[in-house]
């Protein structure tokens, strides 16, 4: 045995390891990712909705930019934060140069490339919708967590662990491998949310999503889960695997 425990960031991820690699469930534990929730802030109704894409380009930026071609309206502005520079792999951006150029050529879009985390957090307080037509099997999704904590509507696919991360709060559609269909489906889903964003029902849903994110995805809760898990693991290693200290790690409340 090369490990005592595997820590997974979602139940979906643990299930994949069990199904594909036959890792027994009792050899793992789920401790989800965490964020520093965006501070609560006042939001007033505005004419133009502020949309955000904040991920590396291969995760769906192409679908998003093609979807904009189908959206014939100007009452929004998209802010794109996308580059491999964040990881020191600037050369990888070359393959997506055409997407960045498309961003630059659309007056409805601002390409911010890479900014500091503190600057991005400031931008979150001005955003309304996370436009994320995800084409990547996320094992978890911190940007969705941050979006919910910032009172943003999350428009995304049900690919990977996104349903688990977003709960019932995202405006989610069924993923498709057909890119052309994906573009059309996402454009429709995004416009539906844009049309209804300021309605009472949507605002109530965003209020609930914010509270959920602040409650379940903050570091205060996650640190305690890690401490409990490590205390349990150390005790088991010291006293044998059949000895378990009564520490309720991975608790959900």
Residue spans for each PLM region:
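Glycosyltransferase donor-sugar binding loop
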Residues: 77-96, 113
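Acidic donor-binding loop of glycosyltransferase active sites
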Residues: 125-139, 152
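A charged, aromatic-enriched C-terminal amphipathic alpha-helix characteristic of glycosyltransferases
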Residues: 177, 199-235
């Amino acid at each position: 045995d090369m490990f005592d425990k595997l820590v997974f960031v979602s139940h979906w991820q643990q299930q994949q390891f069990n199904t594909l690699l036959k890792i027994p469930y009792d050899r793992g534990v789920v401790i989800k990712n965490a964020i520093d929730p965006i501070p609560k802030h006042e939001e007033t109704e505005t004419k133009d909705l502020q949309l955000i894409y904040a991920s590396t380009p291969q995760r769906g930026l192409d679908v998003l930019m093609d979807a904009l071609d189908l959206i014939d309206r100007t009452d929004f502005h998209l802010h794109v934060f996308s580059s491999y520079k964040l990881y020191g792999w600037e050369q990888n951006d070359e393959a997506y140069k055409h997407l960045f150029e498309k961003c630059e050529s659309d007056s409805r879009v601002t390409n911010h490339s890479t900014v500091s985390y503190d600057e991005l957090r400031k931008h979150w307080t001005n955003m309304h919708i996370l436009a994320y037509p995800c084409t990547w099997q996320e094992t978890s999704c911190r940007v969705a967590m941050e979006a919910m904590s910032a009172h943003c509507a999350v428009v995304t696919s049900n690919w990977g662990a996104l349903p688990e991360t977003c709960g019932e709060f995202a405006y989610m559609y069924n993923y498709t491998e057909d890119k052309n269909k994906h573009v059309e489906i996402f454009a429709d889903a995004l416009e539906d949310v844009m049309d209804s964003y300021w309605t009472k029902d949507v605002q109530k849903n965003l209020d609930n999503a914010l509270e959920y994110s602040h409650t379940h995805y903050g570091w205060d809760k996650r640190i305690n889960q890690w401490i409990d898990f490590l205390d349990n693991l150390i005790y088991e290693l010291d006293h044998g695997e059949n000895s378990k200290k009564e520490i309720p790690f991975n608790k959900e409340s």
